C-alpha cells in the first residue's frame, strides 16, 4: 500500500512540476546513451549468462540486450525513437520452436531491463 501511495505521489509531482516543451533527444544524447548501454550490456550478459554458456550465446544475449534497454530508455525520453526498435524486438522476441533460442531471448530481455534500470536509476528493488 505504501508503494502504491508513493507511486501516485511521484506521478502527481511529475505532472504538476513538469516543464511543457519538446523532449526530443539530440544526436549527442543518443550517442552517449548507446555507448553506455553497449558497455553495460556486455558486462550484464556475462553476469546473466554465467559460466555455463558459450561465448557465442553470451554475445547473442549482449546483442539482444542493447535494443531492449534502448526501447525502455527511449520510452522514457523520446517515444518516436523507440518505435523502430519496438517493431524489431516484437519480431525477434516472439516464441520460437527452439527452446534454447527462447531461453536466450528471455536472458537478453532480462539483461536489457537490468541495464535500462541502471541507466534510469530505478533499481530500487
UniProtKB/Swiss-Prot annotation:
Q: Which domain of life is it from?
A: Bacteria
What protein does this entry describe? Uncharacterized protein YffQ
Amino acid at each position: 500500500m505504501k508503494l502504491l501511495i508513493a507511486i501516485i505521489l511521484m506521478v502527481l509531482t511529475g505532472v504538476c512540476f513538469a516543464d511543457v516543451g519538446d523532449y526530443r533527444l539530440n544526436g549527442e544524447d543518443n550517442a552517449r546513451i548507446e555507448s553506455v548501454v553497449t558497455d553495460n550490456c556486455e558486462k550484464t550478459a556475462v553476469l546473466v549468462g554465467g559460466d555455463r554458456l558459450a561465448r557465442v550465446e553470451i554475445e547473442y544475449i549482449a546483442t539482444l540486450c542493447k535494443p531492449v534497454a534502448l526501447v525502455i530508455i527511449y520510452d522514457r525520453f523520446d517515444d518516436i525513437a523507440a518505435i523502430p526498435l519496438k517493431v524489431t524486438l516484437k519480431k525477434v522476441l516472439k516464441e520460437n520452436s527452439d527452446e534454447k533460442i527462447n531461453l536466450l531471448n528471455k536472458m537478453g530481455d532480462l539483461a536489457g531491463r537490468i541495464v535500462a534500470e541502471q541507466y534510469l536509476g530505478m533499481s530500487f528493488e
